């Protein structure tokens, strides 16, 4: 099941597809709706420095020492809400210039960024 979410991320407006991890015959779980609510309320802009740091640590040779425009390297395209009962988990999925095959996931729990990783971690 999916829906659209209009969101401003790092001072740029996006219309993102929200994907809920559901079985074909299943409705979206209350825990997934709660996770989306926390994600919408999260201060995603606060993650910018962490994302820049991640990019520099992973690909500093290609980037240099600073990042002026994060969108040269990272572009959000979707929000994924897994089937978890205990944590309110949401992943902001992003295209990543240096790993176009796998992309990048910013994992939020209860509205807080907890991990930046390969999307396989959450999918």
Task: Identify the meaning behind each predicted range.
Residues 1-17, 73-123:
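Acidic, proline/glycine-rich low-complexity IDRs
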Residues 64-74:
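Extended, compositionally biased
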Residues 1-66:
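Long, contiguous N-terminal structural blocks used for assembly/anchoring
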């Amino acid at each position: 099941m999916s829906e659209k979410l209009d969101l401003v991320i790092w001072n740029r407006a996006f219309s993102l597809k929200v994907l809920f991890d559901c079985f074909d015959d299943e409705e979206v779980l209350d825990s997934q709706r709660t996770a989306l609510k926390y994600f919408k309320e999260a201060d995603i802009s606060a993650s910018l420095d962490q994302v820049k740091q991640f990019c520099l640590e992973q690909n500093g040779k290609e980037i240099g020492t600073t990042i002026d425009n994060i969108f040269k390297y990272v572009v959000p395209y979707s929000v994924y809400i897994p089937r978890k009962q205990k944590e309110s988990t949401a992943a902001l999925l992003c295209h990543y210039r240096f790993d176009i095959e796998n992309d990048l996931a910013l994992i939020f729990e209860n509205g807080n960024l907890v991990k930046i990783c390969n999307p396989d971690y959450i999918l």
